[in-house]
């Protein structure tokens, strides 16, 4: 399952690369009308927090993605967000094991069986989805180099490569 960890690390690295190119705090925290007034910082925080939920729930084998801290620090401070992303990258590679995903419905707490590797894959797909949204905001900022693969699923990249041959 090294591939899943490598792809997750690559996706997080590409996010860090883009964040470090931002010309200032305002480009990280300024609402983007194309994103329903969400910010790059809000999307970054959301990516971070799902990975945090996964890592925090790993020891007990119970992961609750709804129980996010919603820490404004990572929404407003690029340096703090980048540093935490780097910590997540270092901590992600763990042995596979069964886990339960906790989900609160209107009336009940539901547990869904999964495993750690599957949840790393889920977080990768979630990260890429939010990168695609972040890319919309980035396109309005000058002098930022955005990789063609940023915000694009690996399967889509493979398909595009096959079509180009």
Regions found by a protein language model. Name each.
Residues 8, 36-40, 44-47, 74-81:
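Hydrophobic alpha-helical segments and helix-packing faces
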Residues 14-17, 21, 87-90, 136:
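A generic structural signal for well-ordered alpha-helical segments enriched in polar/charged residues
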Residues 20-26, 106-111:
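Short amphipathic alpha-helical segments and their helix-coil junctions
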Residues 25-32, 100-102:
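Glycine- and aromatic-rich loop/turn segments at beta-sheet edges
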Residues 2, 49-91, 97-109, 142-165:
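Short, helix-capping/interhelical loops that line the mouth of catalytic, cofactor-
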Residues 29-67, 109-151, 157:
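Short, contiguous alpha-helical
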Residues 1-24, 41-57, 125:
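Alpha-helical bundle segments that constitute or directly flank the non-heme di-iron/ferroxidase center
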């Amino acid at each position: 399952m090294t591939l899943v960890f490598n792809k997750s690390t690559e996706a997080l690295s590409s996010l860090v690369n883009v964040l470090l190119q931002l010309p200032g705090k305002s480009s990280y925290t300024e609402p983007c009308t194309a994103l329903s007034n969400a910010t790059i910082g809000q999307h970054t925080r959301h990516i971070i927090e799902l990975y945090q939920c996964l890592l925090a729930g790993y020891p007990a084998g119970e992961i609750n993605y709804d129980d996010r801290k919603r820490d404004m620090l990572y929404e407003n401070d690029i340096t703090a967000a980048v540093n935490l992303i780097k910590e997540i990258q270092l901590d992600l590679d763990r042995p596979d094991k069964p886990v339960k995903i906790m989900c609160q419905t209107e009336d009940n707490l539901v547990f869904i069986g999964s495993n750690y590797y599957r949840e790393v894959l889920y977080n990768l797909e979630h990260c890429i989805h939010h990168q695609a949204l972040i890319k919309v905001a980035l396109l309005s900022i000058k002098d930022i180099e955005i990789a063609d693969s940023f915000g694009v699923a690996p399967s889509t990249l493979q398909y595009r490569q096959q079509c180009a041959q």
